[in-house]
Amino acid sequence: MDSTDKNGESVSSVSSSRLQSRKPPNLSITIPPPEASAPGEQASMLPQRPRNPAYMKSVSLQEQRGRWQEGSSEKRPGFRRQASLSQSIRKGTAQWFGVSGDWEAKRQHWQRRSLHHCSVRYGRLKASCQRDLELPSQEVPSFQGTESPKPCKMPKIVDPLARGRAFRHPDEVDRPHAPHPPLTPGVLSLTSFTSVRSGHSHLPRRKRMSVAHMSFQAAAALLKGRSVLDATGQRCRVVKRSFAYPSFLEEDVVDGADTFDSSFFSKEEMSSMPDDVFESPPLSASYFRGIPRSASPVSPDGVQIPLKEYGRPPVAGTRRGKRIASKVKHFAFDRKKRHYGLGVVGNWLNRSYRRSISSTVQRQLESFDSHRPYFTYWLTFVHIIITLLVICTYGIAPVGFAQHVTTQLVLRNKGVYESVKYIQQENFWIGPSSIDLIHLGAKFSPCIRKDQQIEQLVLRERDLERDSGCCVQNDHSGCIQTQRKDCSETLATFVKWQDDTGPPMDKSDLGQKRTSGAVCHQDPRTCEEPASSGAHIWPDDITKWPICTEQAKSNRTGFLHMDCQIKGRPCCISTKGSCEITTREYCEFMHGYFHEEATLCSQVHCLDKVCGLLPFLNPEVPDQFYRLWLSLFLHAGVVHCLVSVVFQMTILRDLEKLAGWHRIAIIFILSGITGNLASAIFLPYRAEVGPAGSQFGLLACLFVELFQSWQLLERPWKAFLNLSAIVLFLFICGLLPWIDNIAHIFGFLSGLLLAFAFLPYITFGTSDKYRKRALILVSLLVFAGLFASLVIWLYVYPINWPWIEYLTCFPFTSRFCEKYELDQVLH
């Protein structure tokens, strides 16, 4: 018994001396004493069996069995009640908005992410913020203070000097070989000290190739006749391996005394700490195979490693050979990281890291993770595919800024060829015409809601058609429905029913006669489907007659307007919903829609045909509100699509790497819909396509990040002026045709509000969760009010301000802003 105590005392003295020698001079660890417990709690203070006793086993001591076998009949932990659906939704929503109870644990991670992004976009940070940025993530002090919270009864303590990997994870080879931070609150981590001394085992992380780069290499290999796997794996063949080389599993040579001290700390506590910043990447075993065994390897710091630590013969029984193939694993999980400080703008400006960067900062830059830009790649792919399909289907309109005039001899209503002109607006984006864009789903107010001016235009056309008649040529060459003034009195006969010459309303009643008509090739007396009889008598108004689908089977009817050959039928021309009875040749030349089945313009709905897409539920009431977000995926041409792709691969991808695809996708879509909604109100007769409002909403996210990081930047006014100059330049570009500045303005306003609500982590650290909740609530309420006001202006109280079109197209020349065939005031 005495010998045992002596041995224990000797071992503990040796252990304490070794720990004192390894302790840095300026390190002090204060362990609060446990509080006095009540007598009833003494039973709970007795040693209990741990969950995993194998992890608590000491290397040098034998485990006592009898004590744990006595407690084998203890009760298992009871089942915990599963949270309800409402609680799960409430907790998930709070975590998504960043106002949950564990926000303080995530605040530091997102604070560092915001600092990195601000340093890339807006310039150098302040000196204090730059020092916080260069510290490891566990050492960054909080803006709210670094004082320790009140200690609990039994705080968890992890030995900061136990650095041996084999003693932290004795049974696993692939666990991270970086020291875990202490769990004592208020004590900074010693990783900065241990990383300098054990820096020879941390090689710099290799840069991984992206999928696009590997695809280009594979295509080049196929052209050269080589194997695809050889081309894609040529770079990775030398240094790629998914686990560390066995000779570098231990960072230091630790003796039994260190083992004795470190065995008191459980494996569960040490493995539960997050080690995402200090975890080093695995070293490649194939990298060390290239080094001859006769020469001692040299670490990156210049320290020669002994051969006894390096060259260990592999054991056949413990060698791991059942891993996933290297090429498959790296193809599935590798991604090209966004290097902070060297973003897209940094590459354009030939920016690089300084050579005097410390190893700690370099490891942080290499290990910092970012989101995958899924939404950016998906959106870019959809934009490119849709643009190519549209151009292949509808062709390219004349390129330029003015109006293009086409002249051709076309057969007209009178049976002679006439010289007619077709005028259309040129498209400098190298894409289809405005009529085709409207048919594809462009933002166009007459297709979204009932327009008063277009409705009045249709009513005027129907009034003229109500007084029309059938003009029959005297030489029996044909007939056409027209006005009396357009029918020649010498060469043709104008058939128009009067009070005495009209047919009776009903075949059985000869009293009341018709006064509206006649109509070429349509008569209630000869039409069998739908028949005019009984309760279904056609009204005495030709603008309300249905389309006759079946005529009486007879060669001659005895009526002059029925026995002639009809020359003209309704044709929907331009984008105003106007209709004209004309020949097929003239209709095709004017890029209209010819209706072979109808005889009157009142029998067709031109606006439904011009708008395309899904037909209206009520042909008289347009209801294609889905154009507000469908137009976000369309472009006016190839150049327009290229501009969007460049913006998305720079600004959008950078923001998505910072905040994630779900937040950026919400801001992109909602700001684009809001911009198109405002454009549909103030510019109702302009066909606009493209994500203009969405792009300015993303620019507003940069302003929000700048405002939230104003106190962190060294020169915030310079960053603000740079962003303002970019927005002003884009606004000036919006004065050109086919670019919608109204969508830019309202997209920017909506993006500004949505960024405050859906980007909660890009904030300065002094705001608490209650203040953040108020900010989110106010931003969402203001956005909802703005969106509701725009909806009311569009559907309930439509407005039409012609002067506002100068904000979206300034007339630099007399014909620079011609009306695109879509006048603000219809005549």
Swiss-Prot record:
It is a multi-pass membrane protein. InterPro entries: Inactive_Rhomboid (IPR051512), iRhom1_2_N (IPR022241), Peptidase_S54_rhomboid_dom (IPR022764), Rhomboid-like_sf (IPR035952). Its main location: endoplasmic reticulum. Residues 64-77 have a biased composition (Basic and acidic residues). One of its GO terms (molecular function) is growth factor binding. The chain crosses the membrane at residues 381-401, 632-652, 664-684, 687-707, 719-739, 745-765, 774-794. GO terms for cellular component: endoplasmic reticulum membrane; plasma membrane. It is found in: Endoplasmic reticulum membrane; Cell membrane. The modification Phosphoserine is found at residues 60, 84, 88, 294, 296, 299. Detected in retina and spleen. Residues 1-87 are annotated as: Disordered. Keywords: Cell membrane, Endoplasmic reticulum, Growth factor binding, Membrane, Phosphoprotein, Protein transport, Transmembrane, Transmembrane helix, Transport. Residues 1-380, 653-663, 708-718, 766-773 are cytoplasmic. Pfam families: iRhom1-2_N, Rhomboid. One of its GO terms (biological process) is negative regulation of protein secretion. Residues 402-631, 685-686, 740-744, 795-827 are lumenal. PANTHER family: INACTIVE RHOMBOID PROTEIN (PTHR45965), INACTIVE RHOMBOID PROTEIN 2 (PTHR45965:SF2). Regulates ADAM17 protease, a sheddase of the epidermal growth factor (EGF) receptor ligands and TNF, thereby plays a role in sleep, cell survival, proliferation, migration and inflammation. Does not exhibit any protease activity on its own. Belongs to the peptidase S54 family. Interacts with EGF. Interacts (via cytoplasmic N-terminus) with FRMD8/iTAP; this interaction leads to mutual protein stabilization. Interacts with ADAM17/TACE. This is Inactive rhomboid protein 2.
